[in-house]
């Protein structure tokens, strides 16, 4: 069994009585600095264990730096940081590297250690950088059962120094345990109250007081007419009516396939929530109530709600039968890692809810590949609405809608250059100090429209149509959920998960872009992206982070199906990776674990790592 303990979760005094129940400890990987107590926490104390309390320890990255620093090494900054960089690792083929051949390993560090000749820690492996010279990559303690590597053996791009090095550590740990006659106590189930659940873990279902007596039944009918326009369908269903709610998930270009139009009415249930509240707001038919969360958080409330809305009998070829459509804010994700969002300032400046969703029980699905359109409902006895909607769609004129040009003058206010450059320098200092492996610096650009455009061209819907025309993308969206309206045009889909049984969660991070232009061929785009250490490193960092997040939910059944492949889109070439995870068939999990898998993966993945890579940095920003 594996248990994950945060380095500030226990004091050594509290942990010490429980160490005999464990066979070994792995510490690391960071980010942070080993000479900052808040970064290293309990780890520093583990190196000082008395002989009777000693336990084999394997350090990774920050773990190596802490081990070496504790026993007399010097800590220095690299001349050139190595985040997401692959290096050849030299070793002597002994100890951790017994029966290990050539090693190409991924590094995520800006700090390194310099070992002293008379110290108690000795070098097992090293890299030889052009920029940094010789850098220690693995060490062992001369007398204690402590080993460590500076690189990341778990990275998807580490070759030769991964699983075999871990196996060697386990072999060395067992050998030391046998020689010293260390006794490992049998696990006591009562220890769950101290350490929580072993990895991986899906929480048991919340009480299902709202379980439906019978599942909702999906009724689906196909429209005979082929090739209906997404825009025409939307406008026939009320997209023009700015005062009403409207939702569209739009596959406006290849490789997107299905577009989903939510057919809303005044009785459609709206769900909103703001970070810090202890209630969910529910609105329909012009009335609103606040439902107390009780002991639940918003995530478990949503999972419980959706469990009560299970549907069956739909067309399995369609990705959506009914459910929640809307947005979740960045602040909701940041709140999950206990970072203050400056709540009072945030609410004063921003009236947009952090959770803004609508439950869609009637919908229209358009299939761009086949040209087919489907009308569906999960409301009982709703066949009349389906028939009338099909008749309305059948009678639509061909090509009736176009996006009108905006003739008003546009002024753009960019961020202050001096302030922006100073923020870049702050980011660079954080990177060199070891506070983070990457940072995403954002700044607001304000676009103002002068003049008085006509009401027909100034609506959010017309603006979305212009966006869709100028930048068609496979994962576009128009969400009009007052007080918020979201217009989106993106080639990237963050997360998808298939229906049970055999639910597969898939993430497709895009890091690396080349704009299409005359003379920019696929070969040139591939050279610019795949041939760029910076672009590959950025993609690799996110791939490894996603693998970590998925492993935390589904266990070891995580696979990188595609790594850094150039894909063609309407206006750009993109560097795309694909990571998938699913529950192991033999996992000891609740009977309905797959029902909550999507929610758990989404929760675990927020806030996205590229925007919140380090607690220290976002706490200070």
Tell me what each language-model feature is.
Residues 30, 144, 154, 444-445:
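Flexible loop residues that form catalytic
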Residues 196-621:
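Extended alpha-helical targeting/anchoring segments
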Residues 2-59, 71, 174:
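Flexible gly/pro-rich beta->alpha loop and the following alpha-helix that scaffold active-site loops
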Residues 5-6, 78-80, 562-563:
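Short beta->alpha connector loops at strand-helix junctions that form conserved
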Residues 9, 155, 547:
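Short, glycine/acidic-enriched loop or turn micro-motifs at the edges of active sites
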Residues 29-34, 63, 154, 330:
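Short glycine-rich anion-binding loops that position phosphate/pyrophosphate groups of nucleotides
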Residues 153-202:
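Acyltransferase
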Residues 42-60, 65-167, 171:
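Pocket-forming structural segment of enzyme catalytic cores
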């Amino acid at each position: 069994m594996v248990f994950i303990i945060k380095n500030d979760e226990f004091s050594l005094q509290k942990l010490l009585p429980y160490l005999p129940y464990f066979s070994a400890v792995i510490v690391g990987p960071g980010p942070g600095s080993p000479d900052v107590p808040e970064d290293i926490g309990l780890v520093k104390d583990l190196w000082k264990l008395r002989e009777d309390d000693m336990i084999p320890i394997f350090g990774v990255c920050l773990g190596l730096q802490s081990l070496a620093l504790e026993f007399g090494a010097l800590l220095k900054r690299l001349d050139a940081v190595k985040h997401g960089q692959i290096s050849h690792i030299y070793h002597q083929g002994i100890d951790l590297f017994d029966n290990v051949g050539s090693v190409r390993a991924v590094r995520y560090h800006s700090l390194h250690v310099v070992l002293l000749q008379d110290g108690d820690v000795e070098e097992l492996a090293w890299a030889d950088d052009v920029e940094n010279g010789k850098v220690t990559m693995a060490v062992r303690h001369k007398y204690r059962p402590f080993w460590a590597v500076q690189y990341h053996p778990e990275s998807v791009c580490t070759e030769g120094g991964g699983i075999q090095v871990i196996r060697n550590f386990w072999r060395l740990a067992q050998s030391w345990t046998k020689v010293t006659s260390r006794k490992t106590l049998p696990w006591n189930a009562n220890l769950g109250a101290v350490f929580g659940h072993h990895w991986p873990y899906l929480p048991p279902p919340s009480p299902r007081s709202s379980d439906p007596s019978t599942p909702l039944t999906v009724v689906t009918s196909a429209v005979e007419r082929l090739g209906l326009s997404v825009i025409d369908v939307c406008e026939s269903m009320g997209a023009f009516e700015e005062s009403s709610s409207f939702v569209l998930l739009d596959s406006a270009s290849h490789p997107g396939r299905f577009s989903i139009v939510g057919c809303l009415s005044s009785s459609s249930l709206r769900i909103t929530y703001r970070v810090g509240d202890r209630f969910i707001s529910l609105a329909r038919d012009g009335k609103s109530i606040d439902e107390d969360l009780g002991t639940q958080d918003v995530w478990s409330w949503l999972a419980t709600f959706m469990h009560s809305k299970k549907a069956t009998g739909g067309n399995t070829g369609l990705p959506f039968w009914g459910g929640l459509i809307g947005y979740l804010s960045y602040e909701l994700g940041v709140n999950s890692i206990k970072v203050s969002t400056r709540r009072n300032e945030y609410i004063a400046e921003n009236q947009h809810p952090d959770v803004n969703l609508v439950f869609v029980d009637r919908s229209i699905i358009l299939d761009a590949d086949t040209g087919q359109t489907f009308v569906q409902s999960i409301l009982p006895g709703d066949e009349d609405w389906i028939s009338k909607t099909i008749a309305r769609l059948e009678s639509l004129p061909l090509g009736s809608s176009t996006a009108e040009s905006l003739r008003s003058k546009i002024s753009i206010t960019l961020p202050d250059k001096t302030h922006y450059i100073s923020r870049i320098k702050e980011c660079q200092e954080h990177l060199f100090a070891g506070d983070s492996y990457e940072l995403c610096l954002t700044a607001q650009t304000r676009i103002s429209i002068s003049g008085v455009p006509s009401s027909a061209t100034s609506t959010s819907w017309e603006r979305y149509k212009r966006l869709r025309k100028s930048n068609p993308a496979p994962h576009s969206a128009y969400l009009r959920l007052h007080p918020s309206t979201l217009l989106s045009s993106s080639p990237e889909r963050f997360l998808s998960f298939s229906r049970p049984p055999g639910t597969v969660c898939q993430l497709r991070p895009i890091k690396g872009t080349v704009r299409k232009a005359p003379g920019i061929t696929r070969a040139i785009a591939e050279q610019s992206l795949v041939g760029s250490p910076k672009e590959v490193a950025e993609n690799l960092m996110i791939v490894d982070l996603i693998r970590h997040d998925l492993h935390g939910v589904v266990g070891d059944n995580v696979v990188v199906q595609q790594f850094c492949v150039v894909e063609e889109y309407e206006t750009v070439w993109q560097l795309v990776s694909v990571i998938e995870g699913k529950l192991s068939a033999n996992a000891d999990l609740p009977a309905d674990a797959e029902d909550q898998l999507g929610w758990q993966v989404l929760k675990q993945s927020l806030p996205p790592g590229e925007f919140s890579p380090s607690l220290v940095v976002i706490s200070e920003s």
